[in-house]
């Protein structure tokens, strides 16, 4: 609430906030954190084999369910597709993203999307995504001057943007 008002320049006593409970019971939305290695540009090549092994294990636990793997880059998506070698994995590029998404949502098989670009504007409701894997925490790009300026002005802004991308 404080962050919202400060970003928009609104006084808190001039607006109302409505808090709604989640429609999903907490036991239906567990979060498991399993760090496997640094996914920074410097270390990603040494972490990718460990990531592939971790993803294989998660896929085995969810063998009859559809899901999505948020890859953060085409490099990671392509690596996982090549090294896991499962017909369940659906990867896309910029030209066929919508078709692959359509096939995943409407198909009967328990496919899993490999995507660096399905964090906004995509509704994987119902059985279209029973699990998600986030390969790298989606921090905003620090090379962007506006992002850096906001981060320096408001210490809470950078982690807030990161968590908003995840949820």
Predicted regions: what they are:
Residues 14-17, 31, 66-68, 87-88, ...:
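Beta-sheet entry/capping signal
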Residues 2-12, 83-87, 128-132, 146-151:
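Short secondary-structure boundary/capping segments
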Residues 67-98:
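Conserved helicase motor "Helicase C" RecA-like lobe of SF1/SF2 P-loop NTPases
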Residues 23, 35-46, 94-167:
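Conserved RecA-like P-loop NTPase helicase motor core
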Residues 33-72:
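Conserved interdomain hinge at the start of the Helicase C-terminal
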Residues 50-57, 79, 99-103, 117:
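Well-ordered alpha-helical segments embedded in enzymatic catalytic cores
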Residues 1-30, 94-97, 109-116:
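A contiguous, basic/glycine-rich beta-loop/short-helix subdomain that forms a polymer-engagement track
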């Amino acid at each position: 609430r404080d962050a919202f008002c400060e970003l928009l320049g609104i006084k808190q006593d001039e607006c109302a906030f409505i808090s709604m409970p989640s429609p999903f019971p907490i036991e239906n939305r567990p979060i498991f954190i399993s760090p496997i290695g640094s996914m920074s540009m410097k270390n990603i090549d040494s972490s990718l084999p460990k990531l592939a092994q971790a993803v294989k294990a998660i896929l085995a636990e969810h063998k009859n369910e559809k899901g999505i793997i948020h890859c953060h880059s085409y490099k990671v998506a392509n690596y996982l597709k090549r090294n896991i070698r499962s017909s369940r994995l659906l990867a896309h590029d910029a030209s066929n993203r919508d078709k692959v998404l359509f096939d995943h949502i409407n198909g009967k098989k328990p496919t899993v999307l490999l995507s660096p670009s399905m964090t906004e504007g995509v509704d994987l409701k119902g059985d279209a995504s029973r699990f998600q894997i986030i390969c790298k925490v989606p921090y905003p790009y620090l090379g962007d001057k506006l992002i850096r300026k906001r981060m320096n002005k408001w210490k809470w802004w950078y982690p807030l943007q990161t968590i908003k991308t995840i949820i």
